[in-house]
Design a protein with these regions (language model features):
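Short, surface-exposed acidic
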Residues: 34-45, 71-81, 203-208
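Active-site neighborhood of HAD-like aspartate-dependent phosphohydrolases
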Residues: 2-44, 181
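Alpha-helical elements of Rossmann-like donor-binding domains used by nucleotide-donor carbohydrate transfer enzymes
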Residues: 25-29, 47, 61, 65, ...
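A metal-dependent, Asp-based hydrolase signature
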Residues: 50-80
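Generic structural signal for small/hydrophobic residues in well-ordered secondary structure
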Residues: 12-15, 55, 100, 110, ...
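Short, acidic loop-to-helix structural element flanking the phosphoryl-transfer center
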Residues: 4, 68, 77-109, 120, ...
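Asp-based, Mg2+/Mn2+-dependent phosphohydrolase catalytic module
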Residues: 2-6, 11, 115-208
């Protein structure tokens, strides 16, 4: 399938390596735990979350708009701890990427939409920097997917040709945008399907 040898992987984090950091399921749990109006919280979230993910708001500023616009019986620190605790790893995917990197000497970069504090927490907690070389997070580069400029920035930072990059994301539209730049892509649906598709691009573990 792949005419060019793959030298670099671009990876989404939420939905691929880890659970999503702060999605509708996590917000529903928060509303139940802290007795919040879920509909109002979601409306406020959607109005301001893009700004947070683009690195133009701190987490405290985001929470001031979405949760702490009125007095609460709980503290911001308690709520932030709850937010951070929603993140869980997908160990099979992490092991797959780690082993492929070792076997093929791949450059590995994360290309994801995430606020700064959540990004840093997840990188440190799950030691993502032990196998990911570069983090092109929307909050670091101030560009969000599906803006093609985030992929252009990633290519420049990693110093890779688009034809030699394989990108894995659970959002098919994001994969399609990257393909428009000549980047090969896999729409991640499960560990098994992604592993099989990577094999079609010349990346398999065999008897590793």
């Amino acid at each position: 399938m792949s005419a060019s040898k793959i030298s670099a992987l671009f990876l989404d984090i939420g939905g691929v390596l880890l659970t999503n950091g702060w999605d509708r399921t996590a917000r529903r749990r928060a509303a139940e735990k802290f007795n919040l109006d879920l509909e109002e919280m979601n409306e406020r979230h959607h109005l301001t979350f893009d700004t947070y993910e683009a690195g133009k708001l701190s987490l405290d500023e985001y929470l001031a708009r979405v949760v702490f616009y009125k007095d609460r019986s709980f503290s911001r620190d308690v709520f932030k701890t709850f937010m951070f605790d929603q993140s869980q790893a997908y160990p099979d995917m992490i092991d797959l990427i780690r082993n492929l990197k070792t076997r093929y000497g791949l450059k590995v970069a994360a290309v994801n939409n995430e606020g700064r504090e959540l990004s840093i927490h997840r990188i440190r907690t799950f030691r993502l920097d032990s196998f990911i070389d570069s983090f092109i997070s929307s909050s670091f580069v101030h560009v969000r997917k599906p803006d093609a400029d985030i992929y252009r920035a990633a290519l420049d930072i990693v110093q890779a040709e688009a034809s030699e990059v394989l990108y894995v994301d659970d959002r098919e539209m994001f994969v399609d945008v990257a393909k428009g730049l000549g980047i090969k892509g896999i729409h991640h649906r499960s560990y098994q399907t992604t592993k099989e598709e990577m094999g079609l691009h010349g990346l398999s573990l065999g008897a590793f």
